[in-house]
Swiss-Prot record:
EC number per UniProt: 3.1.26.5
First-level EC class: hydrolase
Entry's family note: Belongs to the HARP family.
Gene Ontology molecular function: any one: ribonuclease P activity
Catalysed reactions listed for this entry: Endonucleolytic cleavage of RNA, removing 5'-extranucleotides from tRNA precursor
GO biological process: tRNA 5'-leader removal
Reported function: RNA-free RNase P that catalyzes the removal of the 5'-leader sequence from pre-tRNA to produce the mature 5'-terminus.
Protein name: RNA-free ribonuclease P
Keyword hit for Hydrolase: yes
Amino acid sequence: MQDNVIIDTSIFTNPNIYKSISLEQPIDAIEAFIGLTHKSSKKIYMPRTVYIELCKVVDLESIKSRFESSIIIKSPNRCNITINALALFDFVEDMRIRINKGLRIAEEFARDKTQDIQNTISKLREKYKEALRQGTLDSKEDVDVILLALELNGVILSGDEGINSWADKFGIRTVNPLFIQEFLSF
């Protein structure tokens, strides 16, 4: 049986991951990944929203045709995928908790008059982002990875904590992206 593998940008933009493919820059890792896909029996997919995001982060112009010939750019069929109501309930509850935590962080920083404003804003942004986004689905691109994996009964290859956490909730198989080369060679 051939695996359908769904990838996201993290395997090309997270230095800890892309350096397991190529020790150079993200574009070099993408080129090496393309080479791996040609030797693999697996079908590699990337949701269109993720592809658009990747193109904003990495200049793919020099390898765009090879990329699009090697990786299937496909949006999930959002109209025909059914999501378990409990998952939606859990997501809303998780977001409520995160928003409340974010408000507490903002209040804490608003009360702290001892730091300079630039330093305070920088620390606030970091803590707020961690509270609201880390470990959850925080973008439409993340949701598309999950939906496409559900649609294709696929395996997710991602370094995104939120994607991997929600993949686990949906019973979607994930592979540690640090093992990309080994995974694609089987």
